[in-house]
Amino acid sequence: MARSLKKGPFVADKLMKKIELLHSKGEKTVIQTWSRSSTITPIMIGHTIAVHNGREHIPVFVTDQMVGHKLGEFSPTRTFRGHVKSDKKSKR
């Protein structure tokens, strides 16, 4: 179920304050955050946000096409190492 429109998008308060501060200064430094559930808003466009994936912070450069998505969508938490090769000779 989608979030109610009367509530508006969720953005962590601490993250929003950091972005507004950098936006007013005109700086483009990397912002570290653990808030993967925060929604990307238009004020975040052009900033680089390092999103935590459980092990490290992955830098995400926000573009206009990302508005409306969550920050966690752009920092994968699992590493895919490929499927196991089936060895038919060892099964016999």
Curated annotation (Swiss-Prot):
PROSITE patterns recorded: RIBOSOMAL_S19
One GO process term, biological-process aspect: ribosomal small subunit assembly
Coiled-coil ranges (or none): none
Compartment(s) of residence: Plastid, Chloroplast
Gene Ontology cellular-component terms listed: chloroplast; mitochondrial small ribosomal subunit
Alphabetized UniProt keyword annotations: Chloroplast, Plastid, Ribonucleoprotein, Ribosomal protein, RNA-binding, rRNA-binding
Gene3D superfamilies assigned: 30s Ribosomal Protein S19, Chain A
Function description: Protein S19 forms a complex with S13 that binds strongly to the 16S ribosomal RNA.
Family: Belongs to the universal ribosomal protein uS19 family.
Protein name per the record: Small ribosomal subunit protein uS19c
Lineage: Eukaryota, Viridiplantae, Chlorophyta, Mamiellophyceae, Mamiellales
